[in-house]
Each structure stands twice: as structure tokens, then as C-alpha cells.
Amino acid sequence: MYHFVSEQTPEVRLTDEALVTSHVTQYLKSFQLDAVRFVYDRLAKREFCILNDESGLGKVATVAALLSALPPAKKTLVVLQNDEQLLTGWRFHLDTLTDLQVYIIQGVQDTTDSPHSVYLAKWSQLRSIGDLSRLKFDYIMVDNRGHSLNNSFCTSMLLKQFEGRVNVLISSVDVTSDVRLLYNVLRLGGRLEHQYKSFASFDRKFHLPDPKEVFSKRIDLEEYYKQRGFLSEYIKDFRLRRFRHQFDKSLPLVAPEQYKHNLNLWLASKNSQSTISGSDVCSTIASIDNNPAQQNKTGLFEETDRLSEHSVDDVAMSPLIFEYSESDDEPLTVEPDADQNPVLVVSSDDCEIVTPPSTPQNRTPSLNESPRTKSKKKFSKKTSPRKKADLTDSEEDDEATDNMPPRKRTRAATVHLTPKTRRLNVRILRVSLDTLSTPPPSRTTTAIVTPKTEPTARRKNLKKRTVSPVDVGRPATRGMQRLTRSAETKINSKYLKHRSLDDVKRSFPRRVKLEGNQTPRSSKQIVKQEPKSKVGQEKKQKTVDVPAQGTAKRKPGRPRKCQTKTEDLGKTKTKPNSKHLPPTPQVLSGSSLSSEYMQCAQRIPDNLDAIESPAFRVPFTPQQTPMLLTLPSTHNLLNDSEVVSIPLYKDPVETVVINSSHDECSPQDPSQSRRTKALKRKRKPVTSVNSSFGGGLGLPPAKRSANKSPDLFSISSEHSQIPLAQPRPSSPFEGFKIFGSEVKQFQQQLAKVNISVPKKKRDRSCLDILEQMFEPRQQQSAKTSPKVLPTLPLTQKDDAESTITQRRRTLLEDDFFEITNNGQFGSRMRLNSSGEVSPVQPDQQSVRPSQANKITNYLIGSGITQERTQPSNGNRNSILASLRKSPKSPKQGAKSTQATKLTRWFGSVFGGGASQTSSVESVSAPSTPVNSSTSAAACQTRSARSGGASGPTKRKRLELFK
């Protein structure tokens, strides 16, 4: 019995008079029978109760079983939400499980004088009736499964008509979740105590926080459910609330899809048997036809999905197919035997592919086609050929099916048929007679040949025929009823008219709805083709003629029909579908073929391999890591000025620290000159370790945080302007230049091994000339201070360790640190080791350049003009004071920074060490450090650069610039 499974459950006797027979109990679960007992106990006492089981536990079946136990003379009203699916679900359960007479209240004329036991009514119908005093009911039940009590109109109507009279409330939603809902429910059932007559008093007692506040965690969840517990305790005596997880073994009672199928089968069978009054049938049909998406499971299963339009129609119409085929279509079944080849048929509505093995099967059992057939068959009474061309055309437009052979076979069949069968719709003939032999073309020609002027008139007639069933509705149905003498045709007409119009609309998306029905054009073309074609040539000539004749006056979209016809003429081949598929991928843009740009739910085309993937549309993603790892001049975490390269060997090695005056600078201003860019103070470094030449030597970047020096810089400084960025592959590493040493040559040789060295950059040309001028002094200084020069790595292992320790000692001895403001000119302070802060005069800032350049680095490296004794703190302070008082300061302050640097450099070189003051000015002014003030790296790197262990000579010179 549909999805209800018999379990041989014995009958349940509720009382001496009330008995739930085994016919009903065998289809119910034990927990449903428990609910029947619970509700009946209170119903017998005229007490209010709430059936509040969770959705899916079969509340409607429970109530149906309960109603079957009540005396038949008792009249029960069930008030529903305004939902056709709920109404159908109630009718289904009451009719399937019980023998009760059910009546649907629809208007003022309805009364309770009829011999019915159960009355179903939507609350909107009751509200429209107004005065319900003349309707006498013994029991009143309210179904809140559609949240009807959330509607203020429904609640007010129920309270006005039935306050205190409701016996059973059916609800899937927990009534304790809303205080207002529970208050109204208790009023309907007459269970509200006198002290809570007003909602304000009830709310004060059982107030629940707003769920929004609970979800936003402004209110404790435990407190919220504690309050809900108070409400549950208040109504526990007359409420039954159970949950799905308690009965997992028995659930689901039925699969949602199976329930939908059974519901539609029942609905179709009831309509075909005419067991319900005509008004009920029509209302049911109208509701299904107008609200196909609302055929939802109700009663037992309230959580099912919405039905699709086509599935409803197909399932609901299935019984009608068999009846109808028995009456009129039998003569047709004899014809198809001529050519029995399986034909691939695509239904225009569902786009479902059905492969019927033989024509008789296609005729009767096909759920999709036969209902449509019947409706149209009844409508097309005059000329079957015209209809055939019309309908097949629309279908051809949609799916490119095998339409031409069916057409001819249809005509062949129609020749032998009676006038009654001649009215059959082409669609059913196409499906059923797909495998028929080729028809005689004579009938075809006569039927379809028409001048071009006639199709308009025929279109009008066809419009009238096809549209009238939908518009006129019942009159057409009655006419059809007279023809077929069965109520099923009424349903068929409803469905089929609706669906036929849908087909036409779909087949002509670019035209107006009225034009959609003007399919006779296709008949014109077919007529022209067929007269020309002979019996033997029918298929190929149609293929050739259709495009040739119809091209001139065809609207856009028509050629597609001809092409599909051409392709379809191969009888049993499925090529029409395969040819129909390729256009789909063409819609996809090339870039969409890559997985990165596939849109959601976009189908991958079948001919994906044939489509070229347009690489130019895919944005180029630059490689990030490889260059960072390979090039010695690229930057990782630190830049040149921050790295001390230490060999991995135990032999003492002299560590060379290289600083780029260009590395740490902020993004260059195009208005600045090249020398200004080179000499401008640099910002705090953030770049990488390998940017020093140590990467070329294979030295590790150990102690990177402690090694900062502003005095030396590399030529490949432009890379470091973008810290931690991907290096430009076009700018190779050139190596580092150090004045007064051979490190430059050594590094450049190493760099040339890895990367070809381009010509010297133009922005350093002036400094390079000066470097070449004083090359002999560099060599001489190299001899005097051999520690600066790097030897081969194997011979330098121990020197590196001693150099590092030397630097650490100088850090403790160093007293002065300089604090600058974010790498800009001005805002400097001096901080000594004791914590004393002394400001620097602003005019001093103009005197001192922001950072040492190559010229001063060369001077420092040569060591010719430097003092041989390390000054004490007091000596350093006096030097600074003398520098501030120097008569050169204001003059040089007035000059530009570049002129000052060059002038001081030449003065220091050619003036020699004439006086300590001039020496200090020439050296200290241009080499005011930036990084040295920030960390211990300053003194360490200076000591290393000046020779490390060579003595205080170098250290004194470097520490003047703190």
C-alpha cells in the first residue's frame, strides 16, 4: 500500500468504544501508536493537547489513525496553512489509512450537514466565510506545521472563532521557543490560567531573551535554555515532544522521493476514478497545474524537497496512459512493427533521454510523452499534419531529435487510422512510431502543402486551439470528457495544455509568446521539401531542400532547425545528440578552460582537447624564489650594509664588511641628481644577507644583526631599494668596489664567474674617475693595512674569529651613538654610553652629509691623512666643538651638500694631516653615519674595516664619527 509497510501489528483498543483497527495499526510504528494513545486520552476528556513531535515522525498519520478510532458521527475540523501541498498530504493519509469521508470547505455555501467525518479547511477560506457559527464541529484541530500561527490574521481569526475550543494543536516547531506563540496556543486550547490572561503578565513570568541576543553571546546560553525549561515544565502535562534521534532505527519512515512519487500516483488515481467530487478534482488539478513546485510531502514527512514541475506531471499522469491506450490507441500499435529500430528520443520538457526498444513500449508506458499526446490529440481535431509539423518543429528547435522519420511514419499511420485516431497528437505518434517504415509521400504532400499566405490563418487557428484549453479551462475539459468519457482526461488536458505551451515557448525563446505558437512555418518548409522529395529520396532531399528554400525568409534560429532535420534523417543514429553537444564548449571563453577561471557549476566541454588554450589571457605569474636563491647580489633578509661575511673555516680569515650607500635609501626621487642619490642618507635597512659579496664567497650570513656599517657600499645597490622583493633578472650582480683594497677586483672576478658584468654605471662615473686617479694610494694603504684584504678562504679561518672578538671589545669602549629621525636630514641627537643625551646643532646637519660616499670611503681606507692616536672622549668632544666653531662651517652650510663633500674631500686629500681640526672636518663631516648609531654593528664593522687588531690607529679614526 504505497510506502506504508505492514508489520502485522495488532489492533489498539483505546477505550471500549474507540478502537484503532489492525488495518491502520499495521502501517504505523510503535512511537506513532504511543502518540495516538496520548492524544486520545486527552481528547476523550475534552482537554487540550499539543502534538509537538519533531518533523518527520509521522504526525499526520498519527492523527489519521486517531480519527479512525473516533465515532464516524463525530465531525472534526482540521485548520491548515494556505498551502495546497499540506491539503493534499492530509487527503492522502486520510484516504489511504482510513475509510473516513473527507470534505474540503471552500466557501460560504459549504455546511456541516453533509455526511462527512473530517472537514479540511485553509484558514484563509474560514476567514473569508466570516461567520462560522453555523458550522458545527465536535473536535477542532489546528495544524501549525506551515507556521500558520505566525500570521497575525490567522491567529486573530482563530482566536475570534475558536478561542478555548481547539482540542489538538499539531506543530513541528517547539512551541516553547516563542513566548507569544505559546501564549496564543494556550488561549486557543483554553489552558491559560487566569493570572496570565494578559500577555504582559505571561511574559513577565516566562520571558525569553531574544534569540538574536543569544546567538550574539550577549546572553548566557545556559540561562536561555533554563528559561525554556520552565516553559516546558509548565505545559508538560498536555504536550508531547519527541525528537528524530530517539527513533533513528525506524527513520526515515519513507524516502522523500518515494513519498512524492506515491503521493502523485494516489492523486492521479483518485482523479481518474472520479471518487472525489468534480469541484475537488478541479481544484486539485488547478493547484497542481498552477503550483507544480508545491507538491511536497506532508503529514508523515514534512521535510521533503519541492517537486520539480515535470516530475509532478509525469508521475501524476502515469495511470492515465494505460487507460487511454486501451481505448483509442490500440490500432496504432499494430503499425510500428514494420521497422523496429531503437530510436533515441529526447523529451522537449525534461531533456531526459529515453531509448525505447520497441514502439509499443514508447506508446503506452512513456510517462513523459503520452499525457501531452492526449491533450493535444483532443485539441487538434481538423488537420493532423499541421499539428505534426507544428509540434515536431518546436521540439526540433529544442533538442535536435530524430524528428523527420517519425513525421513520415506518423503520416503513414494516420492513413490507416480512423478519424478519431487521426486526431492524435503528433508527439505521441513520433514517440510510438519512431521505428515505422517510410510513409507514402502522397499523403504527406497533400496534408502539408500550403501557400505562404495561408500559414497566418492557420497560425491563428492553431493559436486558438492550443491556447484555448489553458484559457477556457473547464469547458474544454468537459468537451474532452465527452470524447473519452473519463475523468482522467480532465487532468490530462490540464497538464498537457500547460506543458504544450511551455514547449512552444522554450522552442522559440526569441519570439513573443504568440509567435511561439506560429509553428506552421516549419510545416511550410516541410511541405515544400516533401513534394520535391520522392519516396526513395525523402530523407536526403529533405536534408538538402530545407536549407535552400527556407534560407531567404527564415528568421534567426530557423537554420538550426534545418540542420537538425538534416542530421536527424539518419534513422536510428544518436548523432543528433552528439552533434548538438559540441556547441556547448564554444560558448566557453578560452580562458575559462583553465581550472583557475572555471566558473561555478560550469560544465567542462567534451571537446576540450580540440580547443586551444589561449595563454595570452592568463596573467603571467612571476617566479619568486629561484632568483633569490641563486644570485649572490639578490636580497634575502638583510642588505649589503647589514651583512658581515664570515667564512666557514677555522683558519683566521679577515672579514670584509661591505656597505652600500645606495642600499638603504628610500625610493629615489627622479628630481635628484645621481650624486645626490648616491650621497643621500639611507633609510633603515630591511634587505637580505646574500647581497654582500660574501654570498659570492660562499660565506654564511651569521651575526647579521650585529654587523652594520655605513662606510662601504657596493655598485649593485639599486637592487636593494626594494627590500625582500623579487630581483630584476636584467640587472646582474657586478660585485662590490672598495677603495684602497683588492677586494673590489676579487669580488668582481667572482661575480664575473656567475654573471656577466655590464659596463660601469654612468651615475658612478665621476667617482670611478677619482678612484682611478688615486689607485696607487689604495695599493700603498693595502700594504700598510693587510688585514683589510681578503685572502683565499682556506687561509682565513682563524682571522675571522679574532676579528669578531676585536669588534666586540670596541663595542664596549665606544661611547657615542647617534640618533636620527627616520633617515631624513635634521633631528639628530647624540647619546653616549652613560645615557646622556646631547643635541646636535641644526647648522651642523647641513655641514655633514648624510652618509659616507665612495670618496670618503677611499680616504678612510687609504689611512694617509688619519691620526695615529686614538682620541679620548674629551678629545673627541673638543674636536666636535672645534668643528662647530670652524670658520668653514657657515660658508659650507650655505653651499650645497654636494659641493661641500667634494671640497672637503679634496681638502683632506691634498692638505694632508696639517691640523687635527682640518683632518677631522675633512673626514667626519661627510661621513656622518646613520646605521652606526643603531647597533653594535657600527663599532664592530669600523674596527674590522680599519684593520681590527692592527691597533688603535684605525679605531681612533673611525670612532670620531659616532
Curated annotation (Swiss-Prot):
Residues 360-369, 516-526, 825-856, 863-880, 915-944 have a biased composition (Polar residues). Residues 373-386, 552-563, 674-685, 953-962 have a biased composition (Basic residues). It comes from the Eukaryota. GO terms for cellular component: heterochromatin; intercalary heterochromatin; nuclear replication fork; nucleus; pericentric heterochromatin; polytene chromosome. It is found in: Nucleus; Chromosome. Gene3D superfamilies: Tandem AAA-ATPase domain. Residues 1-278 are annotated as: SNF2-like. Required for underreplication of DNA, which is found in many late replicating euchromatic regions of salivary gland polytene chromosomes. Functions by promoting the localization and retention of Rif1 to active DNA replication forks where Rif1 inhibits replication fork progression. Controls chromatin organization in polytene chromosomes. This is Protein suppressor of underreplication.
